[in-house]
Every structure is written in structure tokens, then in C-alpha cells.
């Protein structure tokens, strides 16, 4: 199994270590020099040379949207995990063909959020005010 981690900060490096411990062949995209042998300076170069089973976007939050759009424009259609927060500002993005795109948000298991989900499940949400 092959995975690509985009971004090699603390969270990206943590993903790399966990995946390596699971026996996954891991590649990284980073603009900085990294200690990882299988490293690329751009998403397009990484995708040109490899077919990945899944990709983790762990870059700076303000780059998540452009990284996702680049992956989609290059035709990548396998699983993508995007670290939270999803984007740094509201963005228009088509919801077509997004069943393989996931957000790393572990609070979804919090009992408060589980209760909220059960309350609004099946309801049509018209707006959210926070």
C-alpha cells in the first residue's frame, strides 16, 4: 500500500511515522528539506511518478483548499484525508464525487456531537449560526 502525505510539519510527520509503523510505503510532499527519502517538492511531481492508495493533506490550513483542488484537477480519485480545519475561510467547492474525501476530525466521537447528530439526523438544515 502506498500513501502520500502533503505537508511535513508536526502533524504531517506524525502521519508519516504512524503509516510507516503500519507497513505502508510513504511518500511526502514538502517545500522544505526533509529527512524522508521518498520526498517530492510538488504534488504534480509525486502524482506523475506514483499511484497512491490514499493521500493525507497535512499542509498549512490556508493551503488545504488549493492542495485539494490540485489533486482533483490532476485526476486523483482515491481516498483523501484532510486535516482539520478543512479550510481557513469559506470556499465554494463542488460536492460531486466527494465520497472519498474525509476530514480528520476526531471530536465527531464526542458524546455531545453524537447527541447533536441524533437530534438533527434526517432534518433539513437551512442555516447555522455560531
Annotated model-derived regions:
Residues 17-21, 69, 73, 118:
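Short, well-ordered alpha-helices that flank and scaffold nucleotide-derived cofactor binding pockets
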Amino acid at each position: 500500500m502506498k500513501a502520500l502525505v502533503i505537508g511535513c510539519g508536526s502533524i504531517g510527520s506524525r502521519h508519516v511515522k504512524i503509516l510507516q509503523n503500519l507497513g505502508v510505503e510513504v511518500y511526502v510532499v514538502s517545500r522544505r528539506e526533509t529527512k524522508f527519502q521518498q520526498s517530492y517538492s510538488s504534488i504534480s511531481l509525486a502524482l506523475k511518478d506514483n499511484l497512491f492508495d490514499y493521500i493525507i493533506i497535512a499542509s498549512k490550513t490556508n493551503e488545504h483548499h488549493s492542495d485539494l483542488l490540485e489533486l482533483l484537477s490532476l485526476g486523483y480519485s482515491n481516498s483523501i484525508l484532510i486535516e482539520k480545519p478543512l479550510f481557513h475561510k469559506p470556499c465554494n467547492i463542488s460536492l460531486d464525487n466527494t465520497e472519498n474525501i474525509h476530514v480528520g476530525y476526531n471530536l465527531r466521537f464526542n458524546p455531545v456531537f453524537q447527541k447533536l447528530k441524533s437530534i438533527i439526523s434526517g432534518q433539513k438544515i437551512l442555516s447555522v449560526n455560531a
